[in-house]
Amino acid sequence: MLPLLRCVPRSLGAASGLRTAIPAQPLRHLLQPAPRPCLRPFGLLSVRAGSARRSGLLQPPVPCACGCGALHTEGDKAFVEFLTDEIKEEKKIQKHKSLPKMSGDWELEVNGTEAKLLRKVAGEKITVTFNINNSIPPTFDGEEEPSQGQKAEEQEPERTSTPNFVVEVTKTDGKKTLVLDCHYPEDEIGHEDEAESDIFSIKEVSFQATGDSEWRDTNYTLNTDSLDWALYDHLMDFLADRGVDNTFADELVELSTALEHQEYITFLEDLKSFVKNQ
């Protein structure tokens, strides 16, 4: 009996030695789920039932077979065809192939979308600056819709550019320049039957240092919303005496509209060349 009892500790020790010989797995590793192979092809993960077109979106774009190395898609081809037709239509309805001239001996300087009109009168230099960007008034939903019998040219509303413009008046050897910020009120556009009405108005008036490229906000600016009407009328007469009147404003709209249409056609042509990668 005693030899048998002596064998028990030895057996237990051997068993414990066997347990310590095999390292135990960490608890964190046991809690992690075992990885399972994906049973669905990757190409079907983003495709909904009944959609046979979306699988093509997962494929990388293939360069053109012409060897240019550029990307040409069916959408680009349709886009180019649309732009080609659009350019033809815009050139067909273009009123002025060249920019119209202003009466009153105004000299025109154009730099992209910005234009300047310069004139000298009795020792004074008058400069009118405007930019055609965002100069097309929005089309309201309340406008009458064309009838079905009208032509496509008649259905297209005429694009009229009415930009804000700045008038600068500088005296000879003067250190200050009188600056008048003018704009076209929307309710005055097209009211040509009212002979006494001004088609443009003065919004702000200020003095700026002559020759400064940037205007200073620290200079006092007069807002005409709260201005005495007598003073406002004198300012309008001041501009009219220097050639900035209703006739000038009408011609400025015609010039700005022609310039805006010209730049729009150029933009369409550049966009077409960009899409074609030329």
UniProtKB/Swiss-Prot annotation:
It is found in: Mitochondrion matrix; Nucleus; Cell membrane; Secreted. Its main location: mitochondrion. Residues 133-162 are annotated as: Disordered. Disruption phenotype: Embryonic lethal between 10.5 and 11.5 dpc. Severe dysfunction of the mitochondrial respiratory chain because of severely impaired mitochondrial protein synthesis. It is a peripheral membrane protein. Residues 165-209 are annotated as: Interaction with MAVS. One of its GO terms (cellular component) is nucleolus. GO terms for biological process: apoptotic process; complement activation, classical pathway; cytosolic ribosome assembly; DNA damage response; innate immune response; mRNA processing; negative regulation of defense response to virus; negative regulation of double-strand break repair via homologous recombination. One of its GO terms (molecular function) is mitochondrial ribosome binding. Keywords: Acetylation, Adaptive immunity, Apoptosis, Cell membrane, Complement pathway, Cytoplasm, DNA damage, Immunity, Innate immunity, Membrane, Mitochondrion, mRNA processing, mRNA splicing, Nucleus, Phosphoprotein, Ribosome biogenesis, Secreted, Transcription, Transcription regulation, Transit peptide. Residues 73-90 are annotated as: C1q binding. The modification N6-acetyllysine is found at residues 88, 91. It comes from the Eukaryota. Residues 1-70 form a transit peptide. The modification Phosphotyrosine is found at residue 184. The modification Phosphoserine is found at residues 197, 201. Ubiquitous. The keyword ATP-binding does not apply. The modification Phosphothreonine is found at residue 210. Is believed to be a multifunctional and multicompartmental protein involved in inflammation and infection processes, ribosome biogenesis, protein synthesis in mitochondria, regulation of apoptosis, transcriptional regulation and pre-mRNA splicing. At the cell surface is thought to act as an endothelial receptor for plasma proteins of the complement and kallikrein-kinin cascades. Putative receptor for C1q; specifically binds to the globular 'heads' of C1q thus inhibiting C1; may perform the receptor function through a complex with C1qR/CD93. Homotrimer; three monomers form a donut-shaped structure with an unusually asymmetric charge distribution on the surface. Interacts with CDK13, HRK, VTN, NFYB, ADRA1B, FOXC1, DDX21, DDX50, NCL, SRSF1 and SRSF9. Interacts with CD93; the association may represent a cell surface C1q receptor. Interacts with KRT1; the association represents a cell surface kininogen receptor. Interacts with CD209; the interaction is indicative for a C1q:C1QBP:CD209 signaling complex. Interacts with FBL and RRP1; the respective interactions with C1QBP are competitive. Probably associates with the mitoribosome. Belongs to the MAM33 family. This is Complement component 1 Q subcomponent-binding protein, mitochondrial. It comes from Mus musculus (Mouse).
